[in-house]
Amino acid sequence: MPLYLTESEVEQLLTPADALVAVEQCFERLAQGEVDNRPRYRQRADGGALAVMSAVDRGLRLAGSKTYAAVPGGTTFVVCLFELDGGELTAVIEADKLGQLRTGAASGIAARHLAREGATSLGIVGCGWQAESQVLSIREAVPTIDRVVAYCRTEERLERFCRRLKAEAGETHRDPAEQDVVVTATTSRDPVLRGEWLNPGALVCAMGANRLSARELDNAVLERASFVCCDSIEQAKGESGDLVEPIDQGVLDWLEVHELQEVVAGEVQGRQSSDDIVLFKSNGLAAWDVAIGALAVERARERGVGREL
């Protein structure tokens, strides 16, 4: 019978370290051709959108989809998993926490493979729900990081975030931008990170903007980057203003953009020197939701957590 997992149960079952393992293994299967990922599709819905994204993971013998309604009244996420061998529905998972964990894990994996050796500082622009898992996952993936500098425009939110994550509060966007690893996790439509602020050797993980009309990075970030990668070129072409606009303007070419799975699998070398500026642009893959959802279900069945439908 299918298993139903709530948000609180997912939080009980999985840690950022668990998510790092599940998502990195997913990248390896993507590189091996064992996973087919379908980009997000959005359908307008009364001032918001219904979004659907899906993947088939032959390594896990699972297919799955994440569906969510993002409307003015709120956003609700759900992941459904199906067995490939028999077609049975195996799980329905409330997926807000799941999504937070897998998004943070992607940045952690990028930092593990692309941050310069001995990186000690992390800067984060944005102090919302997703930003928390960015900090936890990158700290887990890069143990040498011992300093976090955060900034957002809302002072109360910034103070609360810094207390919870033991971070320093920056005074402007520039303060986090000057760290070894720089994460943007905002809902801004206009750039919050300028290339001129970056120090040599920085890794930028741009996790926020996932629409063609929104950008977190200015063109100078792309101009200074020695290596640019994303989670899916196909998906980036449909929803990454941070890549599409600079490419349309001649700053970059799609032939120069790689996928993180190539780095994880050792097919390409991302960082060539300690002074290289490297960019990872993420929009999020359904394949990660399937992978981490599968781990949650495995743990739940082992521990007797969840409700059978």
Where are these regions (language model features)?
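N-terminal ligand-binding/catalytic initiation module
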Residues: M1-Q100, G108, A115-G118, A287-V290, ...
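Short helix-loop-beta connector
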Residues: L114-S121, T144, N199-P200
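Glycine-rich Rossmann-fold phosphate-binding loop(s) that bind the pyrophosphate
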Residues: C127-G128
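Short acidic low-complexity segments
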Residues: K166-D180, L193-E196
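Rossmann-fold NAD(P) dinucleotide-binding segment
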Residues: V181, S188-L203, R215-N219
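C-terminal helix-to-coil terminal segments
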Residues: D275-L309
